[in-house]
Amino acid sequence: MAGHDVQYGKHRTRRSFSRIKEVLDLPNLIEIQTDSFKAFLDHGLKEVFEDVLPISNFTDTMELEFVGYEIKEPKYTLEEARIHDASYSAPIFVTFRLINKETGEIKTQEVFFGDFPIMTEMGTFIINGGERIIVSQLVRSPGVYFNDKVDKNGKVGYGSTVIPNRGAWLELESDSKDITYTRIDRTRKIPFTTLVRALGFSGDDEIFDIFGDSELVRNTVEKDIHKNPMDSRTDEALKEIYERLRPGEPKTAESSRSLLVARFFDPRRYDLAAVGRYKINKKLNVKTRLLNQTIAEPLVDPETGEILVEAGTIMTRSVIESIESHLDGDLNKIVYIPNDAAVVTEPVVLQKFKVVAPTDPDRVVTIIGNANPDDKVRTVTPADILAEMSYFLNLAEGLGRVDDIDHLGNRRIRAVGELLANQVRLELSRMERNVRERMSVQDNEVLTPQQIINIRPVTAAVKEFFGSSQLSQFMDQHNPLSELSHKRRLSALGPGGLTRDRAGYEVRDVHYTHYGRMCPIETPEGPNIGLINNLSSYGHLNKYGFVQTPYRKVDRETGVVTNEIVWLTADEEDEYTVAQANSRLNEDGTFAEKIVMGRHQGVNQEYPANIVDYMDVSPKQVVAVATACIPFLENDDSNRALMGANMQRQAVPLINPQAPYVGTGMEYQAAHDSGAAVIAQYDGKVTYADADKVEVRREDGSLDVYHIQKFRRSNSGTAYNQRTLVKVGDVVEKGDFIADGPSMENGEMALGQNPIVAYMTWEGYNFEDAVIMSERLVKDDVYTSVHLEEYESETRDTKLGPEEITREIPNVGEDALKDLDEMGIIRIGAEVKEGDILVGKVTPKGEKDLSAEERLLHAIFGDKSREVRDTSLRVPHGADGVVRDVKIFTRVNGDELQSGVNMLVRVYIAQKRKIKVGDKMAGRHGNKGVVSRIVPVEDMPYLPDGTPVDIMLNPLGVPSRMNIGQVMELHLGMAARTLGIHIATPVFDGASSEDLWSTVKEAGMDSDAKTILYDGRTGEPFDNRVSVGVMYMIKLHHMVDDKLHARSVGPYSTVTQQPLGGKAQFGGQRFGEMEVWALEAYGASNVLQEILTYKSDDINGRLKAYEAITKGKPIPKPGVPESFRVLVKELQSLGLDMRVLDEDDQEVELRDLDEGMDEDVIHVDDLEKAREKAAQEAKAAFEAEEAEKATKAEATEEAAEQE
């Protein structure tokens, strides 16, 4: 027997064909969401407050300080928030301290700071009753970047940019004359020496002393001449910079100084963030820049005077490691003192080394490091600017290297916590000005923190972020895998990211640093390809937001691959050579071969085993979760694998799903971490279990109650249904499955079914990827799914009185009311079809002048005789089913409703959808197709033992698509079915062809794994042997029921008066330009005329035609299409005098063209206007009558008084 048995959870054993020992379990798959939000609550929010506060008033007599904050209990539970369309959020209270510096008085107060949405355990947020996910964003990291460009003469020039988290950019560039310029905040360029002089190093000799003598420096100094002898060089430089930044304003050195300080050295205006400081120190540090260079002068320990490194030594990694403590300390440190007129007058500390130029052994080049400013320094420093200039000048000498902006060392991830923190920080800094003003204006004696803080903008910003940010998305809840994938999604779009139109080919492409960090397969097809990615299965974020992936460390001395796990970011990995996970190892853990396949800086080739530093932990660390669920992925073309991974996310949960016979072993982990199953939180023993709840008694005696969800509507309209897996008496451990979620079976992901599939054509019905299916799959509910739709009706107060929910609906027979209760609401369990009333509702009509008799009737019978319109909620087209639930919300019950709404009724209708012709099916290898015919079981081809085949696929769909994995799955699946086992064949480490054939042989199948099939209609065998087996097939969310649509009479667009388009708007089919050409080609003038008039936008014409048809009269001539009038109006709005002339060149008023029409044909809007007018008249008459009554009454009173 090939393979070995592996236990997945407590309910499933699979025979696994993997050969590689897994040394590291998969991390929790949704930790990217949960860890980030936890960090935000633990310290992120505190840091945001500390960044903005304390705030002082303009006279510095008052100060507002931040003390701390507390998050209280949420107002609603999770379930209540879902039901009431509320947000699952908790109130946050912040403690502030207000200090009066004149009197020394301190007021401390707790201020309510709004409700903050709280993340659920599943990594989602409930916002207004809907489950949402904040997608992590992939952005360019702050730091310093160097690039090269070739001009039209083939000359290489370099550029450099310092990009902060927020603040002004600082750029360097050289031109064709070898002069170096700098740009501040994208303005006009100035020689870089001007900026150096402004920093306080004004003399030419000082500049040569700092940077050394090079052609670029010399040319720039010559260009940068002293123009005004009245000013010092520093003042002149400052004025020149000011002129670039604020052209047209009077320039002084002082104003320039304060402007530069604000632009670069003020922490409130310029922020590198921790990650920016880390990246700058890493790039400008001398350690990385000295690597493999020849030192030109001896390195001497400044304390002892001993020579650490002789001149002429090549600085290899081992040499640098030996003096690392000195390089991090004071070795070759030089302090430069800027002159008094400089922007920043503090001493500038640099590290300065001289090395031999790589291009010319006789030249010496100066390398300047920024001497590693402290991590807490979040602004750029003069040392950073000088070190950046030095790196830039070194590039021309062949030292250093340019950056690749698509490298994952230069792109980082902003997860939920950081995105939220940025939003809050933005609003707090806006609030700061407001607070300052209030502190200055109001009376200091009575001022309290509560009075000066306005929380409205902050709460509004948080609300807006969750409600309408591009990164806050409605959760994709088709099935648990799609939920999981959505939580692990990384998007390069969104605020501060890229836009679809600007993103080029390079950004979207797979980069070598994606290995183990981002999946090279799973990305959408279409305009977002490569911009939206998925985290790889082992990917993990470090504190700076860079993606790390785990490797096994190789002991260089002994050559043993240890089980020590090291997590590396992309730029750390560049320094090492990494062997693949499938490299063979000896018993003692050393490499079995002298040469192994490995990677170094993106080069995949064979490397000697003795230079390997690390080894992959698992073959599946390259791919994402959905991709890791595709068996035999290694045998599929990547384009088809992409479709396979994406289509698994569109699978519809079935009534009784089956886990695949041929899995990858990933199904258990994906189901466990998806959040759709019920997982035990503690060890214990089951004391009660039914379909609604499970009770588990812990060892300490406390009781855990787990509620099981039954047929809840998911975001995608599928049934979210959980099934209890445990029974009374079972012992459960923490992390065990208590109940399966939707699309799960025995604790494993089960997106589809295991039908018997044959690759053969049948009467041409599987032409072009179509799928032929046996009726058994319909009758036995194999591919039946339940769909729930939600409909709501609300009653509002109108001008003419309140709307009412009632059984008494005008002009409706008793038959239509048979399933409504006494309130007029449908009963649960009623079967409804389109057009049936779900909620009976009437709206008051405008009442005309009432006669005395009518007023009498009103007085006797109350509202019965009042004029009302029927505005009931009815079942829309194609939505028939069974009423699953009804929810009623009223103000009386304390439900929060929108203003003006008195009552809200929600009706849930469940539909049981069997598979039918037109539904889309797919395998896991990108082999998708539409069901073209459902054949009776007796007509389907059958196997020699009499088993009929379930599905027939076209064999021509395989060779050109190159997804051979489906054929391997087919054969192995048949063997698994025959042997009665489940199989795991992990990606890149699955069953080899030897394993496959030995399993086929073990199952007693023929050696070619094919079989003879018999025609079900004739009983004759088919000519050739056919590949028949078991393939995992899923039903996708693209169902024909949702797409079928027809219109006869329906709504029209307001402006053009043409019929709307699309099923959602109940629109028509567009008869476009090309279709009109077709009619013109046939000369079908009458058809053409009615297509362009009655059936489109001739308003009067279509009303007349409708009337003529109903009354049996001849159809009148059409009028002028509305779109023609729209065109005329548009031309007139552009100032063109557009008129219509008749045969006698007399101007025709456009509305004259429609004269001769019957006056009784009225535009819909006219009807509304007439109604409104009638209502207003009725109201006016009523008011007049009331006034008359009042005057009469007054007159009577007066008369009485006089008597």
From Swiss-Prot:
Origin: domain of life: Bacteria
Disulfide topology: none
Family annotation (SUPFAM superfamilies): beta and beta-prime subunits of DNA dependent RNA-polymerase
EC number: 2.7.7.6
GO BP: DNA-templated transcription
Keyword Nucleotidyltransferase: yes
EC class name: transferase
InterPro entries reported in the protein's UniProt record: DNA-dir_RNA_pol_bsu_ext_1_sf, DNA-dir_RNA_pol_bsu_external_1, DNA-dir_RNA_pol_su2, DNA-dir_RNAP_su2_dom, DNA-dir_RNAP_su2_hyb_sf, RNA_pol_bsu_bac, RNA_pol_bsu_CS, RNA_pol_bsu_protrusion
Positions of transmembrane segments: none
Basic and acidic residues compositional bias, start-end: 1177-1195
Keyword Disulfide bond: no
Chain residue ranges for the region called Disordered: 1177-1203
Keywords attached to this entry: DNA-directed RNA polymerase, Nucleotidyltransferase, Transcription, Transferase
A Gene Ontology cellular-component term: DNA-directed RNA polymerase complex
Gene Ontology terms, MF aspect: DNA binding; DNA-directed RNA polymerase activity; ribonucleoside binding
Catalytic activity, reaction form: RNA(n) + a ribonucleoside 5'-triphosphate = RNA(n+1) + diphosphate
Function per UniProt: DNA-dependent RNA polymerase catalyzes the transcription of DNA into RNA using the four ribonucleoside triphosphates as substrates.
Family the entry assigns: Belongs to the RNA polymerase beta chain family.
Assembly and oligomerization: The RNAP catalytic core consists of 2 alpha, 1 beta, 1 beta' and 1 omega subunit. When a sigma factor is associated with the core the holoenzyme is formed, which can initiate transcription.
PANTHER family: DNA-DIRECTED RNA POLYMERASE I SUBUNIT 2
HAMAP family xrefs: RNApol_bact_RpoB
Protein name: DNA-directed RNA polymerase subunit beta
Organism: Streptococcus pneumoniae (strain Hungary19A-6)
